[in-house]
UniProtKB/Swiss-Prot annotation:
Pfam families: RbsD_FucU (PF05025). It comes from Thermosipho africanus (strain TCF52B). One of its GO terms (biological process) is D-ribose catabolic process. The active site is at H20 (proton donor). GO terms for cellular component: cytosol. Homodecamer. Belongs to the RbsD / FucU family. RbsD subfamily. It catalyses: beta-D-ribopyranose = beta-D-ribofuranose. This is D-ribose pyranase. Its EC number is 5.4.99.62.
Length: 128
């Protein structure tokens, strides 16, 4: 049995295969996920797990060099990301553009978060 890290086998597998500049998305409960993109649905209940809970676990194993989020996202949402990834580069685009970009991600992790626009695309970085 695995002792540390991410215990969700699907998330662990996806992170392990990411290369530099590959992208994954973490999205809220209502985000439309393209049918051709791998969906990892971890919703447990309305509101659970939150975006932040999922982000914290993912950051244990993933080096992130850029976060793409919607202009419509709240300042609080942006602050959550800044607190968890202090020196990350941000790219802000429209929510419609963000939805289109999810066509090119390796996987989408669907959370139970119900705060509008709690969606981000994480761009994989390098550890050296």
């Amino acid at each position: 049995m695995k002792k540390t890290g991410i215990f969700n086998s699907e998330i662990s597998r996806v992170i392990a295969k990411l290369g530099h500049k590959d992208k994954i998305a973490i999205v809220d409960l209502g985000f439309p996920i393209p049918s051709h993109v791998e969906r990892i649905d971890i919703v447990l209940d309305f509101g659970r797990p939150t975006f932040e809970e999922v982000l914290k676990v993912i950051l244990k194993e993933l080096e992130v060099e850029q976060v793409i989020l919607a202009h419509e996202s709240s300042k609080k949402f942006e602050q959550i990301i800044k607190e968890n990834i202090p020196r990350v580069e941000f790219l802000k685009i429209s929510h419609e553009e963000l939805k289109k970009l999810t066509n090119d991600v390796v996987a989408v992790i669907r959370t139970g978060d119900v705060v509008p626009y709690s969606n981000a695309i994480l761009v994989s970085g390098v550890i050296f």
